[in-house]
Amino acid sequence: MIKINYMSTLFVGIDVSSKSNVVYAMDFDENKYIDSTFSNNQPGADKLAEIIAECMQKHSHLNTIIVALESTSVYSIHIANFLSSCELLMPYKPYVYCLNPKMTANYRKSYVGMEKTDHMDAFLISDFARVGRTKKSEPWRGSQYLALKRLTRHRLHLAECITREKTYMVSNLYLKFSELQLLDDDNRPFSNIYGATSSAVLTEFMSLQ
């Protein structure tokens, strides 16, 4: 578990959408430092990083940054990648957490009658981090996460393709040699009906005769 001095940490909550990022930042004592909206693009991300850096420079008692945002489809990926690796913020050891929306939804229940707006959502996410709810989560590792995500999805795609081709082969095999599927393992001529030997024999010989 990462040890962070919460008393000297700036907690940044971001409500992400396709077009904009609504940002709310406060310290452990709930003093507000940022409450603004930025475009969800590179210029907007650069501007946000500049404002966070200026805030850290202005308030010398702050030396660490925790950024929390909900994992919102693909919209949160770029801003999470940028803030976790931004050179301007590196002196302040930024920790970026992409949260399951269910976690913040459950936390919202502790606020009775809170209205549902983008700015209130950003505040809620910031407060979620302030009270230590991110301690059990792992910080964002964008490049590693995306590489693993693409690899696992490609593996699933290949597995589904193989399953589909095997199903197609079995249906054709039944039409050509229906009894092969009914034989016991000891009586089967091939140890693997999907193997190279089986494929070669069944391709070369057009019938049982």
Q: Where is each model-derived feature located?
A:
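Phosphate- and other anionic-substrate recognition elements at nucleic-acid/protein interfaces
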Residues: 1-209
